[in-house]
Amino acid sequence: GYDRTHAPELRLGAERALLGLVVALFHDAGYIRQTDDTQHRNGAEFTRTHVSRGARFLERYMPTIGLANWVPVATQIIHFTGYEVPFGDIRLDDARDRRVGHLLGTADMMAQMSDRCYLEKCRDRLYPEFVLGGVALPVGANGDRAVKYASGLDLLRQTPQFMEDTIQKRLDGAFHGDYRYVEPLFDGRNPYIEAIDKSLSFLRQVLRSESW
């Protein structure tokens, strides 16, 4: 939808579209353990560093598919899907590359939150991953362990605020509402936002009634 609504000189073009697709497909590759890794038992242990690990994977992988020239861009824009690098510190020379990053980060969050099973995954899958990754019970500077998420249900209780912050600060904020570029493909509708709103409304209802 982006190229449909912009002048030729502003369009991303086929190569950048391919770049975005490749990074989208492998943006979570940093969760994968190396075959010789005897230190970690589960990929979830890489939660805090998986984006940087994914960037290193792209450094190795992209030259094997003829995209070596895009490695410097790919290893930067992958960080639009994570929290390891502040967006202002992501260095890109071409505004079109930054736009690809915004579209990538937008697609990542919208795909997650619009999933029909997103809420169940947060409770049943994401919480155990957060425990293994040190996110649920982070260790502070003084060495004490804090409780950020006490359980899967506690994670669900905090999910509405996360979703609202993501929409406000990421989708509408840092990414400038790029999710709207999908709307020309659906006659002005945005099924992803509709699904997110539906899940958020349902979750609030469940939290009020405590009918888990």
Where are each of the predicted segments found?
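Inter-helical turn/loop segments and adjacent helix faces that build the functional surface
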Residues: Y2-L10, D36-R41, Y61-P72
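Alpha-helix capping and helix-loop boundary segments enriched in small/acidic/polar residues
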Residues: N42-T49
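Divalent metal-dependent phosphate-bond-processing catalytic cores, especially two-metal-ion Mg2+/Mn2+ enzymes
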Residues: G1-R16, F26, G66, Y83-W212
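His-Asp-centered metal-binding catalytic motifs of divalent-metal-dependent phosphohydrolases/nucleases
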Residues: R16-Q39, G54, Q76-E84
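Histidine- and acidic-residue-rich, metal-dependent catalytic cores
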Residues: T49-G88
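Short acidic alpha-helical/loop segments enriched in Asp/Glu that coordinate divalent cations
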Residues: T35-D37, W70-V73, C117-D124
